[in-house]
Amino acid sequence: MSKTQVVHYEKWQSFAGDLLVFPLGEKPEFSGDMKEIANIYNKLEATGDFSGKDGEAVLLYSSQLKKSICGAERILLLGLGKGDKDSDLQRDLLRQTGGLVAQKAAEIKATEVLVVIPTLAGRKSADTLEPLVEGVLLGDYRFLKYMSKKDAPAPYRGLKVLALSFAGAFDKALERISERAQLAADCGCAARDMAHEPGNGWTPKHFSRYAKKLAKSHSLVCTVLGKKKMKKMGMGGLLGVSQGSKESPQLVVLEYSPENPRKTVLMVGKGLTFDSGGVSLKPGAGMEEMKYDMCGGAAVICAMKAVAEEKPDVRVIAIVPATDNMAGGGALKPGDIISHYGGISSEVVNTDAEGRLILADALAYGVEKYCPDYVLDLATLTGAAIIALGHHHTALVSNSDHLVELATRAGAKAGEPVWRLPLTEEYRKQIKSEVADIKNVGGRPAGTITAAAYLEKFIGDTPWLHFDIAGTAWNFTEKKYIPKGPSGTGTRTLIEFIRSLG
């Protein structure tokens, strides 16, 4: 649950907190109770200090004003631009404005902030409210768990109260939209928390503990398969990757099952709690960031909280194959051959291409057991995705044009854009092995696509989406609502995807 309390104010003039915020577009229209703000805007526009352009910000102190207009110590005017962008772009600009609110609050160490939600031409209040609230809460995120309390001065710990007021009337529908935005932001921040945890603070068993706790508090069904059960079921990928580690692998399953669901959706997330590369050891520089190799697992688990609270008419199953990839004495070696759940054999050419090995078992198991209508998997799978798309788009591979359309809409709405890559027979040939059914590396060319081709072997004919979030899960493209570090990417896209179905 968010540390920030979100409340609603009938009249912004009665707010006596640290910071009062007015997001304003160019040439805004002011309602009757905004006369004083209109006067301030007109003076600032005349002097060239503020005109409402996108990204503009002016901080005023109430004590400097000739006439007191509220009890807040400071007033912040933020520019929204002309508001002529397409709906998804405008939505993300509003989200970024919310992030800027959080940044400005941090600069002055404000803990109580009120945002007056504007009425923009051609947009409903709900369309403005949701991304603004998301942006503030996502932008206010910080991970301070391991900061010593002996430090002086104490670090700023973010907003305690986010108050909302409206230029127009507030009603129950807007309250629900506000709660919806809070939930999506909370889930995204929970995924960031998991990714921030070091390898010694988040092990495979932490995934299972978190899932069990979530199941208990939200009436979900949780099942955890351990090493003994995996051996019996022939999950050679997950078992093989875990061989070099002292941590026991876990296959964590969460189920939400309404009566008479319209669809069944299987979500699988890579839960590699630390990736050294195994025997195919990674370079030392930057290896500390390999704690983030479980961001796919974090996304699917945290999205289940939103599913459980919103109760869509869709059955949703989340599976996280969790382990770490270490180079201990029993570790997989290049050239080893493993057998996946269902019997497909694989030649392990490179032990640092381990994500597809653990996902394959989880996908095969989930498809067989739950017979889903749709399968989605998320993984920080390939460096090739970063080479292809940088840190601005998540790579998407699919066997279904319809699902790609749904995923593209969901990603755009969440501010987490995706870009589809092809998957044709030429790429499938790259993973053919001379000694097994397939091999886990298809050479340097098209690494993101050949990794997806590997996973495709385990989903049968089920419509399927593969999200390679390697480039977007950490230090995602510069956005004001995404602080440095893990972004939580994928969590809100999954939430929007399920919302579109249910």
Curated annotation (Swiss-Prot):
Pfam family membership, one: Peptidase_M17
CDD domains (alphabetical): Peptidase_M17
Protein keywords: Aminopeptidase, Cytoplasm, Hydrolase, Manganese, Metal-binding, Protease
Reactions the enzyme catalyzes: Release of an N-terminal amino acid, Xaa-|-Yaa-, in which Xaa is preferably Leu, but may be other amino acids including Pro although not Arg or Lys, and Yaa may be Pro. Amino acid amides and methyl esters are also readily hydrolyzed, but rates on arylamides are exceedingly low; Release of an N-terminal amino acid, preferentially leucine, but not glutamic or aspartic acids
EC number: 3.4.11.1, 3.4.11.10
Chain sites annotated for binding Mn(2+) 1: 275, 352, 354
Cross-referenced Gene3D superfamilies: Leucine Aminopeptidase, subunit E, domain 1, Zn peptidases
Co-factor note (free text): Binds 2 manganese ions per subunit.
Subcellular location: Cytoplasm
Record-level GO BP terms: proteolysis
Main location: cytoplasm
Binding site for Mn(2+) 2: 270, 275, 293, 354
GO molecular function terms noted in the UniProt entry: manganese ion binding; metalloaminopeptidase activity
InterPro entries: Leucine_aapep/pepB, Macro_dom-like, Peptidase_M17_C, Peptidase_M17_leu_NH2_pept, Peptidase_M17_N
Cellular component terms per the entry's GO annotation: cytoplasm
The protein's required cofactors: Mn(2+)
Record: active site: 282, 356
Membership in a protein family: Belongs to the peptidase M17 family.
Function of the protein: Presumably involved in the processing and regular turnover of intracellular proteins. Catalyzes the removal of unsubstituted N-terminal amino acids from various peptides.
HAMAP family membership: Cytosol_peptidase_M17 (MF_00181)
Name this polypeptide is given: Probable cytosol aminopeptidase
